[in-house]
A protein has these predicted regions:
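FNR-like FAD-binding dehydrogenase module
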Residues: 1-376
Length: 376
């Protein structure tokens, strides 16, 4: 387990046994059937548990429903035809009227129309898939697939990368992660993140072996000069690499100052590594620690707000060659922090919008490589 700070650990998760069994049961498959996947021959149960992501459905699978719920001649639910066996061989063009017996038993929402509307609306498809797995959809549409058909549609299990939260020099032979466990209920069933649930339920609780690998970084690294100051922004589990950075900086004994920005919803419940951080502060290893608790007051406060509050000092650090690091959510947080840096350059650097953008995005990030990001 040789690694450096800034690297990530790849974790190869497995599907929850109860979801695998539900899928087998609803399709009427034989769990012990020998099948062949991209990883060789094994039982169907093992294939579903280890080779394919069955905890969440994908767009390709929903699109396949069109062939399952639509009859050969026109858009009629397979369910309806099965209820009216006398007309199961009836065929017609879309413009032809339906037989009376089919009209009577038609549900309020035609499954084929629902599939078509989902396939035509990207946002609707995303919303639909966000809260459903294959079991949900199979129950909703009452469709059957062979294992081989399902393998062609289901996505393969992909490893998840987690920023390493420890220094190898401080913890030889060990690697530590900071993981937010995702669990929730929807449509009457318990759900969660594939890898986070797997680690929470299996590691330390069973003899389960976990597949892992190192994912080295080439760019998200500490300055070669140990006396260089650094600013770290890592809200939530984004603090992970900066715990490693701090352990390494303490181990190396350089004179560079360390400033950590951290935040989450509440100080009472999400103050990760509180004792460790307080120890760094007491020992003088952490020069400054700035927090942003978004729900501990009426007004929501995030790390980008704290950055702008300390804009003058941050700009002074930049002028003195400090490195700036950010880790965490790329959709909102990273963009807001990026904008805050541009505004700091405008307000405290006396730059125009164009010059400030060039300084942050070109000079610091690309030329000097002292604005570094690990976002996801």
């Amino acid at each position: 387990l040789d690694y450096k700070v800034g690297d990530a650990l790849g974790v190869v998760p497995e599907n929850p046994p109860h979801i695998v069994q539900e899928l087998i049961d609803i399709q009427g498959w034989d769990a012990e059937q020998i099948v062949t996947t991209h990883n060789g021959e094994k039982t169907l149960y093992e294939a579903l548990k280890k080779d394919f992501e069955v905890h969440m459905a994908n767009k390709k699978f929903v699109q396949s429903l069109a062939e399952k719920v639509v009859s050969a001649g026109m858009k009629i639910s397979v369910k309806l035809v099965s209820r009216t066996r006398g007309t199961s061989n009836w065929n017609a063009e879309e413009s032809s009227p339906l037989p009376p017996e089919l009209v009577k038993s038609k549900p309020s929402e035609d499954p084929s129309e629902k599939v078509e509307s989902l396939c035509e609306d990207t946002k609707a498809m995303e919303d639909y898939l966000w809260t459903r797995d294959y079991v949900d959809i199979m129950r909703e549409f009452d469709v059957k697939y062979s294992p081989e058909e399902f393998f062609e549609l289901a996505g393969r299990v992909k490893p998840r990368l987690y920023s390493i939260a420890s220094s190898h020099d401080a913890h030889p032979g060990f690697v530590e992660l900071t993981v937010g466990i995702v669990r929730f209920s929807y449509h009457g069933r318990d759900r969660g993140g594939l890898a986070t649930q797997f680690m929470a339920d299996e590691i330390g609780n069973t003899d389960q072996q976990v597949g892992v690998f190192m994912s080295p970084t080439k760019s998200f690294v500490l300055p070669e000069d140990k006396d260089t100051d650094i600013i770290m922004v890592g809200p939530g589990t984004g603090i992970a690499p900066f715990r490693a950075f701090m352990e390494q900086r303490v181990h190396d004994g350089g004179k560079g100052k360390n400033w950590l920005f951290f935040g989450d919803q509440s100080e009472k419940t999400e103050f990760y590594y509180k004792d460790t951080i307080e120890s760094w502060l007491d020992n003088g290893d952490l020069y400054r620690f700035t927090t942003a608790w978004s729900r501990d007051q009426a007004e929501k406060i995030y790390v980008q707000h704290r950055l702008k509050e300390h804009g003058a000092e941050i700009w002074e650090w930049f002028e003195n060659g400090a490195y700036f690091y950010i880790c965490g959510d790329k959709t909102y947080m990273a963009k807001d922090v990026h904008r805050a840096l541009i505004e700091i350059a405008i307000e405290h650097g006396g730059m125009s919008e164009e010059d400030a953008t060039h300084f942050i995005e070109k000079t610091m990030m690309k030329e000097q490589k002292r604005y570094l990001r690990d976002v996801y």
